[in-house]
């Protein structure tokens, strides 16, 4: 029986060339951000705890300054628009699964035709003195990682008996999802981990590469 392809595509460092949260805190946060980031990357604290604390360093009054900065700063990885079109033409289900925050993610993606693409990310609350992150897609009972935006929770909604589940990503926040996916399209840290853990994977530099990989996968799976 053929399976339906479903893609879980990361945002920071995958759709965009660089990690936008790091760019934002480097620009706007006091020096404490570096120690917090190191604790997240070394897994001493959860992503949810760390990202929440990072944004608590930032006054809510900076909202528009941050948006203006990151929309100008963010570079979309080549081939993304073509990748979205390819998924649409081929009937491949695409979800954007991001540990990023709605208030900067949505303006960056605004130029693209994503009306039919579900976007899962963290929320934001500017009603207090400092930015508070909200977690509408937190971990389910099967995950204890404190992901914030739990990619494995979303992946588990798709039955592997009927769906071929592909994670596209680059970093530590994609690793748990990659471990339960059927296939991984990876770069940077995630590519090294996929190799180390012997996960079925291909590597990519642009979304043109991703399209080529999907064409190969389709021949084998669909």
UniProtKB/Swiss-Prot annotation:
<comment type="pathway">
    <text>Amino-acid biosynthesis; L-methionine biosynthesis via salvage pathway; L-methionine from S-methyl-5-thio-alpha-D-ribose 1-phosphate: step 4/6.</text>
</comment>
<dbReference type="InterPro" id="IPR023214">
    <property type="entry name" value="HAD_sf"/>
</dbReference>
<comment type="function">
    <text>Dephosphorylates 2-hydroxy-3-keto-5-methylthiopentenyl-1-phosphate (HK-MTPenyl-1-P) yielding 1,2-dihydroxy-3-keto-5-methylthiopentene (DHK-MTPene).</text>
</comment>
<dbReference type="InterPro" id="IPR017718">
    <property type="entry name" value="HAD-SF_hydro_IB_MtnX"/>
</dbReference>
<dbReference type="InterPro" id="IPR050849">
    <property type="entry name" value="HAD-like_hydrolase_phosphatase"/>
</dbReference>
<dbReference type="InterPro" id="IPR036412">
    <property type="entry name" value="HAD-like_sf"/>
</dbReference>
<dbReference type="GO" id="GO:0019509">
    <property type="term" value="P:L-methionine salvage from methylthioadenosine"/>
</dbReference>
<dbReference type="GO" id="GO:0043716">
    <property type="term" value="F:2-hydroxy-3-keto-5-methylthiopentenyl-1-phosphate phosphatase activity"/>
</dbReference>
<comment type="similarity">
    <text>Belongs to the HAD-like hydrolase superfamily. MtnX family.</text>
</comment>
<keyword id="KW-0378">Hydrolase</keyword>
<keyword id="KW-0028">Amino-acid biosynthesis</keyword>
<protein>
    <recommendedName>
        <fullName>2-hydroxy-3-keto-5-methylthiopentenyl-1-phosphate phosphatase</fullName>
        <ecNumber>3.1.3.87</ecNumber>
    </recommendedName>
</protein>
<dbReference type="InterPro" id="IPR006384">
    <property type="entry name" value="HAD_hydro_PyrdxlP_Pase-like"/>
</dbReference>
<dbReference type="Pfam" id="PF12710">
    <property type="entry name" value="HAD"/>
</dbReference>
<keyword id="KW-0486">Methionine biosynthesis</keyword>
